A protein has these predicted regions:
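Alpha-carbonic anhydrase
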Residues: 2-246
Length: 246
C-alpha cells in the first residue's frame, strides 16, 4: 500500500461542493513518518503553514480540559448504506445525508467518520488503541464539529465487525456494500455523561483551526483482533498531541 499517496484535506475548496469533508489530491505528499511526517507538515506546502504556526492545534491531552455535561448535545443519527474509502491515511465511512448532531440548538450534518490508530487525544499522557472521529458541518456557517470516541481494547465491537470484512485495500476507490447498513449511533458509548469540549484544528494537513472538538468521556471497546486488522491495513496514523493554550 502506498502510504505516501498524494492526498490533502482541501477544506476551503469543498465548502460549497456538497461533497462534505473529503480528501483530494495535492501537489505535496504527507504521511505520519519521516521527512513528510507531522514534524514537517508545515514545511511541505504554504497551505499547511498552520500545522507549524497555528496556536490552537489538535489533538491535545484531555487533562488540560474540564469535562462538561452533555446537556447541550443531541444525536439524530440514522442508518446508512456502508460506503468505505481507503484514503491511504485512514479508512473513511461516508454517510448519507439526513443524520445530524445538535449542539446548542444548532444542527451539524454528519458527513463521515474515520479511524486513528493509536488514539490522537490522550488522557494523562496515555493513548487508547484507537479513536473514531465523526465529522459534522453546519450548512449555513460551514462550521465544523468533530465528535471523538476513544476505543479501548476489550470485547469485540459488533458494529466494527459488520464493517471490517469490507475494509478496502485499494486507495481512493469508494466501495458501497448495499446489504450492510450501519448506524453511527451504535459506535457511541451508552454510558457517556460528559464531554471534553475545546476549540482546535483538523489533525491532518492543512491543520485548519476551524473545529469544535467534542471528545466523549467514556470509551467504547474493540477486540485486539479488530484493532490489529485495521493496523495491518493502515499502520499508525495519529498526529502527536500539540503544545498550545487551552
Amino acid at each position: 500500500m502506498n502510504r505516501r499517496f498524494l492526498l490533502k484535506a482541501a477544506l476551503g475548496s469543498l465548502a460549497g461542493s456538497g461533497l462534505g469533508l473529503r480528501w483530494a489530491q495535492s501537489a505535496r505528499a504527507w504521511s505520519y513518518i519521516g521527512s513528510d511526517g507531522p514534524d514537517h507538515w508545515g514545511e511541505l506546502s504554504p497551505d499547511y503553514a498552520a500545522c507549524a504556526t497555528g496556536r490552537h492545534q489538535s489533538p491535545i491531552d484531555l487533562g488540560r480540559v474540564e469535562p462538561v455535561p452533555m446537556d447541550s448535545l443531541q444525536f439524530d443519527y440514522r442508518p446508512t448504506p456502508l460506503t468505505l474509502v481507503n484514503t491511504g491515511h485512514t479508512v473513511r465511512i461516508d454517510y448519507a445525508s439526513g443524520s445530524r448532531l445538535i449542539l446548542e440548538r444548532q444542527p451539524f450534518e454528519l458527513l463521515q467518520f474515520h479511524f486513528h490508530d493509536p488514539s490522537e487525544h490522550t488522557r494523562s499522557g496515555q493513548h487508547q488503541p484507537m479513536e473514531i472521529h465523526f465529522v459534522h458541518r453546519n450548512a449555513p456557517t460551514q462550521a465544523l464539529v468533530v465528535l471523538s470516541v476513544l476505543v479501548r481494547a476489550g470485547q469485540e465491537n459488533p458494529t466494527l465487525q459488520k464493517m471490517w470484512p469490507y475494509l478496502p485495500s485499494q486507495i481512493n476507490q469508494p466501495s458501497t456494500v448495499m446489504r450492510e447498513w450501519v448506524n453511527a449511533r451504535d459506535l457511541l458509548p451508552d454510558t457517556a455523561t460528559s464531554v471534553f469540549r475545546y476549540s482546535g484544528s483538523l489533525t491532518t494537513p492543512p491543520c485548519s483551526e476551524t473545529v469544535t472538538w467534542l471528545v466523549l468521556g467514556e470509551p467504547v471497546t474493540a477486540s485486539l483482533a479488530q484493532i490489529s486488522q485495521f493496523y495491518r491495513l493502515i499502520g499508525e496514523n495519529a498526529r502527536p498531541t500539540q503544545s498550545r493554550p487551552t
